[in-house]
Every structure is written in C-alpha cells, then in structure tokens.
C-alpha cells in the first residue's frame, strides 16, 4: 500500500458545465440544473453557489432569483450528460493503469508505478478534457482513494475560494508529494 497512488478526476459543476458546452452564453451567469420534474437544484455553477443556492434547494424557494439576480434554471438533460461523461472518461483513462468510474463525473485512476512528472501528466489530461470535451475538472492524488477524494476537494476549494488552501494546490493537488508540515497545514 505504501507505493499505491490514486488520482480522482472530477468534473467541475458537471451538469452545468455540460450545458455550457453547447450554450457558451451561460458562462459567467448563475446557472442551476433542476431535477426530474424541475423539483430542486441538482447542479449549481460557481455563480449560483455565490448566491447561496444550496444543493437540493427546492425550485419554488429560489425561483425569485431569476428576476433579482438573473438566475438561469435548466431542466436536466441526462442523455447529454451521459454522452459527455463517456467522452471525458475515455480521455481520463489515459492517466494511469486502471480506471474505476465512480460516478457520471468522477473516475479513480490507479497511478501506482507511473513514472515521470505526475503533476504535468495530470495537467495534460485536464487540459485535454477541457479542450476536447469542454468540461473543466480538478484532479486529486493520494495514496488511497479516500485521500485522493480529499485531495480533489482541496484542489476544487483552492481554485473556487482563493485563500482557503495554498494556491499551488488549485486544480491539481497531490497529497502524496507534500512534506509533513505542508500536509499537516492542509489537513488542519
């Protein structure tokens, strides 16, 4: 286990990002995707999160934000999300040895024994996913899947909320490469 290394690649605000691929005019706007029957928010853009919209917020309670803040609410298009997920996962598979698709927008990659500059390798995959599929993603690396998930959370938080974590951990965070003091600081 000491030599194990996993990456977790996770699409950012995945359903909203999928919608923005085909509707770039939505970039920079507060956007949510609603559940079946448009009952509640199941995905939120960073702009919508900044308005305080919680995951699972009932549509009838936040509907007024359309008028007051220009909130765009979209009905879910699961066929579209599945297609873009398939494209993303096929690119992500090239990151390491084995892939375990964890959800529609998350994939664990076994990177144990992969040689070379791992951050550069992750950056290349991240850039390909963005360029070829249109989906922004963050990558977390750790010696276990749980720590890779935590590293991904740190990578997303460092990007979305500057100052919450060191800036160099934004987008791609490798917990396995941090020295003890840096690791303790991040986990505090």
Outline where the language-model segments fall.
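Gly/Gly-Pro- and Ser/Thr-rich, intrinsically disordered tail segments characteristic of DNA damage-repair
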Residues: 1-188
């Amino acid at each position: 286990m000491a030599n194990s290394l996993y990456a977790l690649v996770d699409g950012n605000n995945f359903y909203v990002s999928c919608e923005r691929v085909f509707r770039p005019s939505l970039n920079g706007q507060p956007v949510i995707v609603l559940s079946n029957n448009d009952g509640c928010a199941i995905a939120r853009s960073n702009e919508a999160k900044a308005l305080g919209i919680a995951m699972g917020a009932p549509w009838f309670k936040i509907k007024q934000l359309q008028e007051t803040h220009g909130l765009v609410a979209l009905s879910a298009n699961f066929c579209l999300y599945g297609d873009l997920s398939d494209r993303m996962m096929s690119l992500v598979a090239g990151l390491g040895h084995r892939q375990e698709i964890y959800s529609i927008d998350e994939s664990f990659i076994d990177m144990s024994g992969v040689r070379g500059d791992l951050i550069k390798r992750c950056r290349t995959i991240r850039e390909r996913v963005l360029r070829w599929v249109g989906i922004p993603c963050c990558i977390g690396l750790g010696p276990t899947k749980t720590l890779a998930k935590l590293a991904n959370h740190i990578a997303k938080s460092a990007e979305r909320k500057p100052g919450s974590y060191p800036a160099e951990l934004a987008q791609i965070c490798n917990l396995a490469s941090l020295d003890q003091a840096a690791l303790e600081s991040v986990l505090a």
